[in-house]
């Protein structure tokens, strides 16, 4: 079963607390999502393989390290996942970005896919699916399944805030996928929102409902 990584870095926790506050406005919320995403990208890529390369510095020839292995891809789940993309791109500016569009049925809380655009070389990439919230887990489960259907073999999931119910569902349906979180909260409420959570991330990111 895929591991769950919850980051306790002081900067991440501090920024998450400000993000959670009901009085935090759209501009600051957007900036915080971007900042926490960059910090998470730094941690998630810690295990990337390295290879030795010979370079010439202004002083001498030297053997140094560069990232090796498969190319990376980021796939935000629309729309809220878009808020995390720039934070990841600051750390990994050359990665390709796919998109998966899902909306949640207000009655069943289950997701429905309406858009999918992936790099043409899916089988040659390690993917990081990004979505600020992991609530019921339905959107993440479907997004991961869509990637696998198109040939993806290595997938990670990065979320700012998660409920145990969502984590358990992803682990049950995709045990090969590692999950990376800035916060693991208490539970879901009767409306499918994470408690204490941070509200509707998409609404708070874009200022619309």
Curated annotation (Swiss-Prot):
Activity-regulation annotation: Allosterically activated by GTP.
Cofactor note: Binds 1 Mg(2+) ion per subunit. The magnesium is bound as Mg-PRPP.
EC number: 2.4.2.9
Catalytic activity annotation: UMP + diphosphate = 5-phospho-alpha-D-ribose 1-diphosphate + uracil
Residues bound to 5-phospho-alpha-D-ribose 1-diphosphate: 79, 104, 131-139, 200
CDD domains for the chain: PRTases_typeI (cd06223)
InterPro entries per record: PRibTrfase_dom, PRTase-like, Upp_B, UPRTase/APRTase, Ura_phspho_trans
Keywords, comma-separated and alphabetical: Allosteric enzyme, Glycosyltransferase, GTP-binding, Magnesium, Nucleotide-binding, Transferase
Family membership noted in the UniProt record: Belongs to the UPRTase family.
HAMAP family: Upp_B
Protein name (Swiss-Prot/TrEMBL): Uracil phosphoribosyltransferase
Gene: upp
């Amino acid at each position: 079963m895929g591991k769950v990584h919850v980051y306790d870095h002081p900067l991440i926790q501090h920024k998450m607390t400000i993000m959670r506050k009901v009085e935090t406005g759209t501009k600051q919320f957007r900036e915080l999502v971007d900042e926490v995403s960059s910090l998470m990208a730094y941690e998630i890529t810690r295990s990337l393989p390295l290879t030795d390369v010979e370079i010439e510095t202004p002083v001498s020839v030297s053997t140094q390290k560069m990232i090796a292995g498969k190319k990376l891809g980021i796939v935000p789940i629309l729309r809220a996942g878009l808020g995390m993309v720039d934070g990841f791109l600051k750390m990994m500016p050359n990665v390709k970005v796919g998109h998966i569009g899902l909306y949640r049925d207000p009655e069943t809380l289950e997701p429905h896919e309406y858009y999918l655009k992936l790099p043409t070389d899916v089988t040659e990439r390690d993917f990081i699916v990004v979505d600020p919230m992991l609530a019921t887990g339905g959107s993440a489960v479907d997004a991961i399944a869509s990637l696998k259907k198109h040939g993806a073999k290595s997938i990670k999931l990065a979320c700012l805030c998660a409920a145990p119910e969502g984590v358990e569902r992803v682990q049950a349906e995709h045990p090969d996928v590692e999950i990376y979180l800035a916060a693991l909260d208490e539970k879901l409420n009767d409306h499918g929102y994470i408690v204490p959570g941070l509200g509707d991330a998409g609404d708070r990111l874009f200022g619309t409902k």
